Amino acid sequence: SSDLDFYCYKGLTVFEMDDRAVVELDGGKYTVEQALEKGPQYAKIYISLGINELGYFNDEAFHQTFGDFLKQVKASQPGAVVYLENLVPVNAEKCAANKQPYYVNNDRVAAYNAIFPQLAEEYQVVLLDVADALTDENGILPADATVDGVHFTKAWYQKWLAYLMEHTVDADCYAAGQTAAEGANET
């Protein structure tokens, strides 16, 4: 659909939202943060970041930087419902077979997934539990759902999209929640 924009780039991390120009907009190239300021105002923003950061081994820096990014998104897109997606666990066997880096593992995914609920609460954004929706009964990505242990097959991308479309919040309720949270923070 022409009313969708994707701000994405291979290997992009939350640590680069304010300094890596990857978004083409009006003939220029901008960082994601700049594009969100200069570009259109969106009704919904979905944020899916974290797998490329697994090798940083600094959960505090991840938390802080992600929080700064969420604050910036909300400031530049005040009318948007912001959805934060957690990380889908990987398939260890397929990761090994495809020579994924050693740090791309479910212990690291779990460490970051423990941070997302804190971020959602701190910054009053909607947390989407894509991890639960896209894993098997053991909490891992099924082998037939992934091409390399991390990235999905076409069918699994479609399952992800269906989950996102089925798990939305009413924009007016979201806005009311933002206002209530601001009031609570001022007391």
Language-model-detected regions and their locations in the chain:
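Hydrophobic/aromatic beta-strand patches that form the interior of the parallel beta-sheet core
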Residues: 5-7, 83, 126-128
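Generic structural signal for well-ordered alpha-helices
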Residues: 66-70, 113
